Amino acid sequence: MNVALVALSKPSASTGCNTADEFIAYCARVSNPDNQNNNKTAPGLLKYLIKHGHWSPFEMVSLTMEIQTTRDISHQIVRHRSFSFQEFSQRYAVTNVFQIREARLQDEKNRQNSIALDYHNNCHRRINERFQMAQTKVLRTARDAYESALEDGIAKEQARALLPEGMSGTTLYMAGTLRSWIHYCDLRRANGTQQEHAEIAERCWSIIGDHFPSVRKAVDDLNNS
């Protein structure tokens, strides 16, 4: 898994804003032009907007992230319909990036949750070894069949049916407003999200915090209150 910021709205010099945080406050003050360039109080205004659910100013800036993951996780990500996506096409290009996954146990109380193995437990270590061996065997067979199909002239869009989605790597670009990113990160960092997806959301939130520190602090403070 890897996440990187590849694009971010940048305020023009005419706004007098130095940061994206300040630009959100600038847009929020559209009805108060005499105070629109008051960057000093921008953090306080952002905190107020978040606390009281005034989200429209956060739609004035957008971010695009590059996400490298597996296709089963990307299927979960693209369900967030307020975003725009571009994803690696298995119809157009040959898949040659694969990943062996870790073993986790099913949570019997929550079907959407898994439980980490205890590697001090001999039984759990054997479970992990069997799972790793099974994946290696499946992947070797699938890759051999996939490559043979391509050599026989089978179209990529058909040959991809031979590949296990949970081990097939993909890259996608995910673009959305800051409002959408806040909602996505809140939802997907919470309990009930698959661990691999939650790790992506955590990384996205960390990146957002680097560029919107006042926003991140206000959201985190609200969630922890």
Task: List each model region and its residues.
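Family-specific signature for flavin-dependent thymidylate synthase
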Residues: 1-225
